[in-house]
Curated annotation (Swiss-Prot):
Name the record gives this protein: Probable metalloendopeptidase G1-type
An annotated GO BP: proteolysis
Binding annotation for Zn(2+): 41, 45
Domain of life: Viruses
Active site: 44
This protein's UniProt keywords: Hydrolase, Metal-binding, Metalloprotease, Protease, Zinc
Family statement drawn from the similarity comment of this UniProt entry: Belongs to the peptidase M44 family.
Classification via InterPro entries: Metalloenz_LuxS/M16, Peptidase_M44
Enzyme class: hydrolase
Functional note: Seems to be involved in viral proteins maturation by cleavage at Ala-Gly-|-Xaa motifs.
Cofactor note: Binds 1 zinc ion.
Molecular function GO terms recorded: metalloendopeptidase activity; zinc ion binding
Length: 590
């Protein structure tokens, strides 16, 4: 690790897929509390800008931090180009960017509203911890920010000037003289301390039960913020599923999720306890770069390589014993937060400023101090990398898709089905997918199904009526029978579903993945969409799908860009109506 004179920390991570990865601590949406919620997320969208034909890049805003990364595309750009591109997001002519075009701000606010819509159609993305801290359940920014553009612009300026050197963490794939000089002349010029300070007023959030949509019964237990506990949690994350951590303000929580309600109840009632007796004696942790960046930003006193702490702390069973006792003591004192699966839209006792509804209760269970646990919690151990292949006509398809999305597993779409890479045993996956809570959770967001239902409409010979009879699966893709797609006179189908989206097939003699990606970014810059999924159907034909609150505008843009198209425009309604979706099936007799 290299520390610049102003406190910027630089790590060499030759194993990551990114060229450069930058994080800014104390810069997430937790800092929006008391201001306009969504400023942090808006700033992230404004800052990142790149040529998608030369680079792959992304950014994200979390509760405590913001992160950005960039990677060159081989043959289109090089490593130093990536470094310069990421630097350009923050600096212009060696000066910190703090003046933003109002028209760009407007478009990005529209994009944020599309992201909110997308996330609420596909996920349950409510952050209860920030809500308990006096924020909202959703803190990513809404379209009503357009009503306060002058204030928003001032807050963006002030937020940029709160970036300081000690809060910057940079991972680079390699560190040569040129790369180091570029970083020193940009992020190395940031001040060591901010010009102004703000201290968010956090509420006491312990001893609460939150009832909300969730696939698991989750308990977040407050533990001491010590180097020993942090390294212990990292070792546990490397070893087991359903164990992670959260940081709220200056507090550290271990999160433990249960598939069965009885296991959860035994734990919070002191009948069972955690025993970490089977954690391997790690000398190196193979944590992904996202997890490492999260750790360095949440725990700024981690000033060395994570793996160095394994020997410095001299992690042992005694280290885990201390964490076990810390957890058990917090359970006894109700220093924890519970997320209890709850799917009713009509039962609630709290709402945030955006009128999102939720149930929050006080923990009332009592554990006697002399009560000794009789059982050990069964933990799901991580396996070596496994792969599942699910055919499109499998009735379990949607469950597996939601499972994969929830765990951020890679989903690879093929002609006949999807491949999902994971680290679960077959028994553990079965127990999760067959649990009542996961079944309710997977059915609580039906919008994810539309993408696959309508894909099958275009590539199979089946009618929409046949396809709708098989909602739990999709009709098997019939590409192996060499179906040929002909573009007829009708290029638009208007339907009514539970969601706003545009999908369909587009054709162009020069179409490829790059053209599709560029199209997505053009639509994003206009504030018309947040994300676009695509599947290659033939050499010159792609299927695309995107949620949007501006379906007519998206259709107009796509119909002008791709002359050969057949698109479905869905608008929200109480009763689904697919009656306009008629197609001709031509059978060629040989």
């Amino acid at each position: 690790m290299i520390v610049l004179s102003n406190g910027v920390r630089i790590f060499i991570n030759s194993n990551m897929n990114k060229d450069i990865y930058l994080g800014i601590a104390s810069f997430g949406f937790e800092n929006d509390i008391g201001e306009i919620l969504g400023i942090a997320h808006l700033l992230e969208h404004i800052l990142i800008s790149f040529d998608s034909s030369k680079f792959v890049a992304n950014a994200s805003t979390a509760r405590k931090y913001m992160s950005f990364w960039c990677c060159s595309i081989k043959g289109k750009s090089n490593y130093i180009d990536s470094i310069n591109t990421l630097i350009s997001w923050f600096f212009n002519n060696n000066k910190l960017r703090d003046n933003f075009c109002l028209n760009d701000i407007k478009n990005h606010i529209k994009e944020l509203e599309n992201e909110y819509y997308f996330r609420n159609e596909v996920f349950h993305c409510m952050d209860v911890l920030t809500f308990l801290e006096n924020g909202d359940l959703y803190n990513g920014g809404r379209i009503d920010m357009l009503n306060n553009l002058e204030s928003v612009n001032n807050m963006l300026y002030n937020r940029m000037h709160k970036i300081i050197g000690p809060n910057i963490v940079i991972f680079v794939k390699e560190l040569n003289k040129n790369c180091l000089m570029l970083i020193q002349n940009s992020f190395g010029t940031l001040p060591s301390c901010p010009m102004s300070f703000s201290f968010p007023n956090f509420s006491n959030i312990d001893g609460k039960i939150i009832m909300m949509p969730s696939p698991f019964y989750t308990v977040m237990i407050k533990v001491s913020l010590s180097i020993s506990n942090v390294i212990s949690i990292m070792c546990l994350f490397e070893t087991y599923h359903l164990i992670d951590y959260e940081t709220v303000g200056n507090d550290l929580y271990v999160t433990l999720s249960f598939v069965k309600e009885s296991d959860y109840e035994n734990f919070i009632n002191g009948v069972s306890t955690l025993k970490f007796n089977n954690v391997p004696n790690y000398t190196v942790l193979s944590l992904c770069d996202d997890f490492l960046m999260n750790a360095y930003l949440c725990f700024p006193w981690l000033s060395n390589d994570i793996n160095n702490y394994l020997s410095t702390v001299r992690y042992s069973q005694n280290m885990f014993k201390n964490l076990e006792e810390d957890i058990q003591n917090s359970i006894l004192l109700k220093k924890y937060i519970v997320v209890y699966p709850h799917f009713s839209k009509t039962v609630f006792n709290k709402n945030d400023s955006q009128m999102h509804k939720i149930v929050i209760l006080d923990c009332l269970n009592e554990i006697k101090e002399d009560q000794l646990p009789k059982l050990n919690v069964n933990l799901m151990k991580k396996q070596t990398k496994n792969e599942i292949f699910i055919k499109y006509n499998d009735s379990s398809l949607i469950k597996y898709i939601i499972f994969a999305i929830g765990y951020k597993n890679n989903i690879l779409r093929g002609n006949e089905g999807v491949s999902i890479h994971h680290q679960f045993s077959s028994e553990d996956i079965k127990s999760i997918l067959e649990s009542d809570t996961f079944l309710k959770y997977s059915k609580s967001k039906p919008a994810a199904m539309y993408q696959y239902l309508l894909l099958s409409f275009f590539v199979s010979g089946y009618s929409i009526e046949d396809i709708l009879l098989n909602r739990e699966s999709t009709i098997k893709l019939l590409k192996q029978y060499n179906n040929k797609i002909l573009f007829g006179k009708k290029s638009r189908y208007d339907i009514t579903t539970k969601s706003n989206f545009v999908c369909g097939i587009i054709k162009n003699k020069n179409i490829n993945n790059n053209v599709i990606t560029n199209t997505m970014w053009e639509l994003k810059k206009k504030g018309l969409i947040y994300s676009m999924e695509h599947t290659k159907i033939d050499k010159r034909i792609f299927y695309i799908f995107m949620f949007t609150i501006y379906p007519d505008e998206v259709f107009l843009y796509l119909s002008k860009k791709f002359l050969s198209h057949c698109l479905i425009v869905s608008k929200t309604g109480n009763i689904e109506d697919f009656s306009s979706m008629k197609k001709d099936v031509i059978i060629k007799l040989c």
